[in-house]
Amino acid sequence: MRIAYDAKRLFNNFTGLGNYSRTLLDGQLKNYPEDLHLLYTPKVRATEQTQPYIRRNRCRVVRPGALFPGGFWRTFGLAGRAAKDRVDLFHGLSHELPIGLVRRRIPSVVTMHDVAWHTFPQMYHAIDRRIYDLKARYACRYATRIVAISESTKRDV
């Protein structure tokens, strides 16, 4: 199976969302050694935590070309790239999916960790809350499956 991931957090976040991404991928690699894992990310921070995924045999890091800025690529370019890479499944590891997976008939999973921008709106700028909300709503509407990491998140979503 060819599984694609929005791996931005895996390579650039070294707390909750990044740890979740790396732990999930470790489990996939251990339990399904025949699968190929395509790690889509706009940039890679090469650290002790990320080096294993850069060099691992069944992982391939995929970055945008020069024409696509990172955020634009993650939202509007990944579905096309996933189709080109003939992926069997796309996993949005943190609240969002690229636009166009459904049109390309690529099944998807999105992991929802929380909806903190709703729970604690005072901690977020209005524009950020709007963007997070739009991305999360889109992902939950179009995902083949939604993973909520807790019962509380399940209720909130």
Task: Walk through the language-model features, giving the residues of each.
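Carbohydrate transferase catalytic cores enriched for Leloir-type hexosyltransferases
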Residues: 1-157
